[in-house]
Amino acid sequence: LIGAAMYANQVLGRSGMEEEAVKRNTKQYLAPMKAQATPRGVYDLYPAFPVGENKIRSGIGCLADWIERHGQVVIDGYGGVFWDELVSELGDEFRRRGKCVRWFRTDVAMRDARTLEEMLAPDLGGEDPLFGRMTERQLRDWFDPGKLNAFRPDQEADINVLIGIGAALAGWKAPLIYVDVPKNEIQFRMRVGWVKNLGMNKPKNNQQTYKHFFFVDWVVLNRHKAECLPQIELIVDEQRRGQQLLMMSGEDLREGLHRMGRNFFRVRPWFEPGAWGGQWMKQHIPGLNEEVPNLAWSFELMVLENGLMFESNGYRLEVSFDFLMYNDYRQVLGESADVFKTD
């Protein structure tokens, strides 16, 4: 997988769709905010599970409305989210409304990169390109407890926002928003250096970054996600930003996952070139970008890196497959649930 990802990076260079090239290195199209139902018998690139009418909302203004109604919120989420852009877009929206907002960023409470590197060295296996050890660490280990617990809402501000990875660990008694991003988009962002490993100051090469994701970052972030799931009041799909940001209530998310776990469903596939790639998929699957030199990978059963789409009024909101396992793994696995659990 790492080798295939590296090959794809070499083939694709630093290009992509013109408007996306700066921050994602791929020629795969960004999943659409809205999509029409696929005709019967045609391969569906964006399979989605229906959650009912008017369940999914869109736009940075809608997110700002939700935050303004509550006054004090915690915004946690996954590694790979463009946190600076999210703060900037929300900040612009609140300034237009004349609101005084106090922002608290969790990254300032993280331990320094050298300390984290020493802590994680046993899990990462040095310079070996493939082998490491699944970490037993928890996300809390990345933070200085004194700094994390020092965040206090400003009583003079109209709105207080604690935002960033691990925000829920600070113990604020406030509604929790969780911002998710698909793992394929994380990797596309990684290839242009926009995504670094958790707590690191600078990016590694792509192969070592992915290895670090696999053995460390995604392990601890998934554990934290599982702990957050019952408390999430709003889930945000961040792969598109600005007016194409999508969100749904935590209650509708959990109900959708609950129903999905008792039904048939498909993950959203994604595609990449590779050393053994050919032209068959481009010729037989409508909607794929035909500018790629070949297609070798159809990531559809690789659920570690796949997402699940929910549909309402044509909107397609995506969350990672992990959410389904944390919510309903017994329904998904049946009699094998006690053996494999959420893994």
Give the positions of each predicted feature.
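Glycine-rich phosphate-binding P-loop
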Residues: 74-90
